[in-house]
Swiss-Prot record:
E.C. number(s) listed in UniProt: 1.8.4.8
Pfam entry (one): PAPS_reduct
UniProt keyword annotation of Cytoplasm present: yes
Pathway: Sulfur metabolism; hydrogen sulfide biosynthesis; sulfite from sulfate: step 3/3
GO cellular component, one term: cytoplasm
Protein name per the record: Phosphoadenosine 5'-phosphosulfate reductase
Purpose: Catalyzes the formation of sulfite from phosphoadenosine 5'-phosphosulfate (PAPS) using thioredoxin as an electron donor.
UniProt xrefs under SUPFAM superfamilies: Adenine nucleotide alpha hydrolases-like
GO molecular function: phosphoadenylyl-sulfate reductase (thioredoxin) activity
Gene behind this protein: cysH
Major location (coarse): cytoplasm
The reaction(s) this protein catalyses: [thioredoxin]-disulfide + sulfite + adenosine 3',5'-bisphosphate + 2 H(+) = [thioredoxin]-dithiol + 3'-phosphoadenylyl sulfate
Amino acid sequence: MTVLPALPPLDDLETLNVHLETLSAENRVCWALERGPDHPALSSSFGAQSAVMLHLLTRFAPDIPVILVDTGYLFPETYRFADTLTERLKLNLKVYQPLRSGAWTEARHGRLWEQGIDGINQYNTLHKVEPMRRALEELQVGTWFTGLRRGQSSTRTQTSIVQQRDERYKISPIADWTDRDIWEYMKHHDLPYHPLWEQGYVSIGDIHTTRPLEPGMREEDTRFFGFKRECGIHENI
């Protein structure tokens, strides 16, 4: 059993984050499961390096709900990867989808992702943000685990290990991990990268707004035609 050090209370987030920076990712997870609000859950895109957080969380909470937002436009490889990891890690997978199908949305609005930044934002709200917000509410999630890392993009450099959003706490236990840390964890535990990783895809979302990394590109340029990096979930929830 992991013995956790005495840490500041949740209502002193600034001091708490300073202390959490000194702990391992494993101890951060244990702390959040023990001291955080009820009904923890993990969100996962089943993207390039998603196996790390899925493995890390289920080591300590085997039955934790794993939320996947299925936009209807994921890569076929992503659906198969989700099946593979769900079977291997015995995941308690909870799939949430938009209130309207992609075909219905296209009939109403056209291909929103081809309509500039405003269209992309509207698409993300309908197909990503709303389903995730609904999942968190229906599952009554008090402690929300994410795989956000500071090194992923310029929009994530200030990611705290714990944040408060209304009455919910958002926990990013590998916020300070580097790509090397990810690789070492995956190698040690024999975890797979997403099948598209070997084809140059370093950040994997929807099939129509994801590109492989090419010379001269930043990782964040591979999403949403370079307009933005975030899909809205971690900006708006």
